[in-house]
Amino acid sequence: MQIKIKSKEKYLIGVSGGSDSMFLLNKYKNQDVIVAHINYNLRPEAIFETLLVSKFCQKYNLELKILSFDSFKIKKNLQSGLRLGRYQFFEKIYKEFNCTKLLVGHHRDDFLETVFLQKKQKKIVTFWGIHKKNNLFNMEILRPFLYWRTKKQIIRICQQKKIPYLDDQSNFTGKYQRNQIRFLLEKKSDFSLFFLFLFYYLINIFKLIILKNQKKILQNWQKTGYNINFFKKIKIKSKIIFLFVNQNFDNVKLTRGKINEIINFICGKSTSGAFLLKKNNYIIKKKWKILPKSSKI
């Protein structure tokens, strides 16, 4: 079911000009909203997307904030750089207008694409796909259509209701991993895709129950001051280390091998030492306790 929007709240809506975000904007255009649009200046046709969003907002008297982003300044990992720039822009507007939620147009296909991307990258996950609600960059993010609309449905409704949109043509090339996964999923029947979604949706319910128990164990360990002897008695050490690192450090890539190295470091005979997670980020072993530190002491 669709999440109900409370009229007393103020929403920031991220709008690219594509079918997903324009469908979302049209749905909530009569609510108290601020519209945020970014022109990444990567494609000549991007200006037409900006004009489309501007025209729609003018028609319905919606507040619009536009960022012209210099994507060519990003030297490494373009996708990560664009994502960071996007959310920093959203955060600025969110604070400026005292918004209560950021709405984005993710749908069921995005959920499945993320699942298969996680599998392809062999990521350790506590949740498959995308969360319907989460907090990021000090914003509460809501994806109203994540579980109940597909890309096909959104395009069909946009065409029926004459909602204007211009989909990013780079989404139809095989340049990015996500696009490659999208092409594979498009070959599957609607029934197969729904079954896949339902399968991972139910797995996530089970995962969240397990995660709740794991967080309790982590909290109990934390209460001991991260005592090493307490940790040695924990049966699911790898799960707890995964949570411990993600709770105390930012942007640390964890593999199963690295988690095992951390466990061996903690449980080793030495009573002191430092384990380097990444530059200036260490797990310190001192007096039978573990200390998460952003710089070595």
UniProtKB/Swiss-Prot annotation:
Keywords recorded for this protein, A-Z: ATP-binding, Cytoplasm, Ligase, Nucleotide-binding, tRNA processing
Q: Which SUPFAM superfamilies does this entry report, sorted A to Z?
A: Adenine nucleotide alpha hydrolases-like
Which GO terms of type biological process are on file?
A: tRNA modification
Q: Which domain of life is it from?
A: Bacteria
Q: Which CDD domains match?
A: TilS_N
Reaction it catalyzes = cytidine(34) in tRNA(Ile2) + L-lysine + ATP = lysidine(34) in tRNA(Ile2) + AMP + diphosphate + H(+)
Instruction: Relay the domain remarks.
Output: The N-terminal region contains the highly conserved SGGXDS motif, predicted to be a P-loop motif involved in ATP binding.
Q: Which family is annotated? A: Belongs to the tRNA(Ile)-lysidine synthase family.
Q: What does this protein do?
A: Ligates lysine onto the cytidine present at position 34 of the AUA codon-specific tRNA(Ile) that contains the anticodon CAU, in an ATP-dependent manner. Cytidine is converted to lysidine, thus changing the amino acid specificity of the tRNA from methionine to isoleucine.
Annotated protein name in UniProt? tRNA(Ile)-lysidine synthase
